[in-house]
Amino acid sequence: MKNLSKTEIAVMTGKTIFQNRIKQADRAAMGKSELLIKKSTNVKLGKRVTKGKWKGFPIFTLTLEERATCPRSCAHWADCYGNNMMYAFRYQAGPELEAMLETELAELQRKHPNGFLVRLHILGDFYSVGYVAKWAKWLGMFPALHVYGYTANQPDAADATERSIGQALLSLSDNCGSRWAVRFSGNFNRATMTANSADDSRAMAAVTAKQAFICPTQISKVTGKYAAKGEETLVPDCGACGLCWTASKPVVFITH
């Protein structure tokens, strides 16, 4: 009898492969200076926005547990890039996380009153309507807060829980202006604020028709094609691009 692999078990149970990299949002379980919302050290994201109306904003990130907080309908449920992120800490969803996030956002508001940008989520997704409502509340509480990211929760999902989360996110997008730029991943029913994979022919057809754009951080500055590792790209990072939070057209990502 064949034993299931760690990946197969994680996919089946809806958890991360790396259970030893999950942390509770609890001061006793975290390092003395450890924060949930971390300064970006990701070369693909950049450390701050260097172009456009948000120029100068420092970039921060939040990482939750993949699959445990995601809808099962996600196209990358099985091949999530979190499968290769064995060093990333994932924070457990729930009231403790939300309480600590509010405290940290208050401090970021104090430190960066002119604006800061939070990328949601490096791993994981919006796990409840209540959690979405908290972000709506925080946008009201902290005027310097700006958010961008992606969600697999669809407003027209067949699953009622996913649909309610997706509709809450859509409502937030419709009512919060440019400060909330969360795109719906794998959605071909909407003409704006989506993020799709180049593996899908519909995405590339939209690019050809100039109804979508390929992420400039993935395109070689020399060849105009997908950039090889180490090759200079059209823009070096998200902070130097800004299209995901300034453009409404769908963005297309090349799977890597």
Model-derived regions: residue spans:
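Class I S-adenosyl-L-methionine
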Residues: 1-256
